Amino acid sequence: KGEKYNIKPIRKNNTKSSKKSAKADLEELIGLDEIKSEIRKILNYVSLNKERGKMPTLHMCFYGNPGTGKTSVARVIGKLFAEERILPGNGDFVEVHGRDLVAKFVGWTAQKVHEVVGKAIGGVLFIDEAYSLISRGRGGFESEAIDTLIKEMEDHRDEICIILAGYTDEMKELLKENPGFESRIQFNIDFPDYNHVNQSILVFD
């Protein structure tokens, strides 16, 4: 029987493999003071609500240009959520591009999205260039990918943190593509550009 399609290579790492704590990793991110402050607030908010038996949705949207630290921060978030037992896994981090979620034939896209999400259950699914899911009249199966992704975000809201990332304007356009995103994305984080001094020491994506 065999699979109907081949998913493009997916980066999957265990973010707990480092001997350092997640909080130490967070503090070592250079040039991201405002972002680190936001992550601490998110961690406190989620931990407090979990203690009260009101586990919030963990899904996020990262806005910013390439090289502003989005991937690095997403990895740290995965490790934080694992160490704090917010997510049930071991800090697994799966990274894909938005275009990787769209298949070429009818009915395959939903299965593809489901399989990718399944690989990240218990950890973080980081979807870079998520705005490539905007159909723009191309006649593909982008809408099917979005509909399936939104359903997966709801069905596994306590088991996974899905992070959508990309350029600010394009990401805002994506979120308007389907109103279901708004109720499922709990946290929005802006990643500013850096001057030449900060860029020389920043840990790039």
Predicted features and spans:
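N-terminal accessory segments that target, anchor, or regulate ATP-driven/P-loop NTPase machines
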Residues: 1-17, 157, 161, 168-169, ...
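Conserved small helical "lid"/interfacial subdomain of P-loop NTPases
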Residues: 191-205
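Conserved AAA+/SF3 P-loop NTPase catalytic/coupling segment centered on the Walker-B
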Residues: 121-150, 156-163, 170-176, 196-200
